[in-house]
Amino acid sequence: MPIIQFGEKDLLRGKVVLPAWYRMRIDEIGEAPSKDGGSTNYPVAGTILHNADDGSTDFAGVPIDWNFNSKAIGFAVGFLEAFGVKAEAGKRFDLNSAVGKELDVYVENGEYQGRIVNRVNHKYRAPR
């Protein structure tokens, strides 16, 4: 008999949040080739701590995942700047240095395969 068990994050993964700025902790940043092998994906996993504007914890604990891609790496500039890092041409950056740190991320709602999902459209700011 197959037996499964859920963790707290599993139960919150599909929860759709209200569009807003959220304080988020970066839990993990990975690196993997894209499906076609023509670029590299950098998946980011974060967890909402609270609403960054009003402090509400209604969506605390909700995991949010998004991605950077080597073919459009310019979208990572705002992410780095939110940590006080100045992006410069030719300079290399270790995305893993963001793991465990906090920043404010604007989370929107979007549609994916006919359902409403949380979406990060690369709007970042330093915590206020």
Where do the PLM segments sit?
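Short beta-rich binding modules
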Residues: 1-128
